Amino acid sequence: MNPPKCNDEDYINFLIATPRQVSATEAARVQPEREEAPAHDAFTRLLQRLEPDAETVWHEAQTQVSLAHGILVLDDSTLDKPYAKKMELVTRHWSGKHHAVVRGINLITLLWTEGDRHVPCDYRVFDKAQDHLTKNDHFQHMLNTAQGRGFQPACVVFDGWYAGLDNLRLIRSFQWLWLTRLKSNRKVNPDRQGLRPLSAVELSEQGRVVWLEGYGLIRVFKIVATDGDIEYWATNKVEMSVLERVKWANFAWAIEHYHRGVKQFCLIERAQVRSKRAWRNHIACCLRAFLRLESHCYHHGISWFEAKTAIIRAAVRAYLAQPLYTLNPTA
């Protein structure tokens, strides 16, 4: 059997460099001229040959993190696939981008950050029909893995979707702090006068210590937006100050930046494949491409946009020196 003509590094570098088009055909077209250059079939086989494994992402991410500093942020994002009728892994999920339930592939990521870093350390692809695991199962598996790897985060921040009692108790068992948003109907006891929904309790932006049903003492901050929307932020650190809550909440926005970055600059939504194995391998390679892009930008003090633009700048300069497309008379 002939050896493979391309490997995962070839595909990762293609993802970093290509501006929009992600296909095996395009990957083959842009290969440097050489003997035995990989054809499009080589990249198609690559995405079927690799073993999808989140451990590979961690192997590269661990060089970018500090286990004893920073925070862990967990959230999911939907890779839009509104017209994919026969693509595997596509199910219906809530999209924060569209503010509606849409068709797509759901990616759950555990991100490490110190505010200015964006390092995906672990991830899961939602496929309940195959593995029978819910998003909360993935949440717990990734945090158990993070604890086993030696993480000691200053805080774990996550969306209210994951604020169930089992998840809160798991984080407490690690002796970690958590910060999340609770729904207004969560039952608390603020004054030993019985359980009431959060919406019926007198709360303020300064926070108040209450007893969460089934859990114990927590501190809840009531945040009222300028448009009247109300959020109830909660933490198991009952002495947490307003400034500390704001600090960790701002740090947690890094995962939203990561979601946009991995879609816009690593093109995680754009693979022209159908099978779940190919999609899993494409997603893993995109996260590894993002790690390289993020590391380069952090050490050189530039944005992801600038780094991506710099790749094609030389090609634009060469074209301007010798334009190929001219106006040819037809009359």
Where are the model-predicted features located?
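Glycine/proline-rich, flexible active-site/cofactor-binding loop segments
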Residues: Q21-T25, R29-V30, I108-V119
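Gly/serine-rich nucleotide phosphate-binding loop at the start of the catalytic core
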Residues: M1-P52
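Generic hydrophobic, aliphatic-rich segments that mediate packing or membrane embedding
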Residues: S23, V57, G70-V73, N106, ...
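Generic alpha-helical scaffold signal
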Residues: T18-Q21, A37, L67-A68, V101-G104, ...
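Short gly/ser-rich anion-binding loops that grip negatively charged ligand groups
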Residues: A17, E33, G96-A100, A129-H132
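Single, function-defining residue in the core of a domain
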Residues: M1-P4, D8, N13, Y83-K85, ...
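Active-site-proximal, Lys/Arg-enriched surface segment
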Residues: T44-G115
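A broad structural signal for alpha-helix termini and local helix breaks/kinks
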Residues: Q31-E35, V65, G150, C266
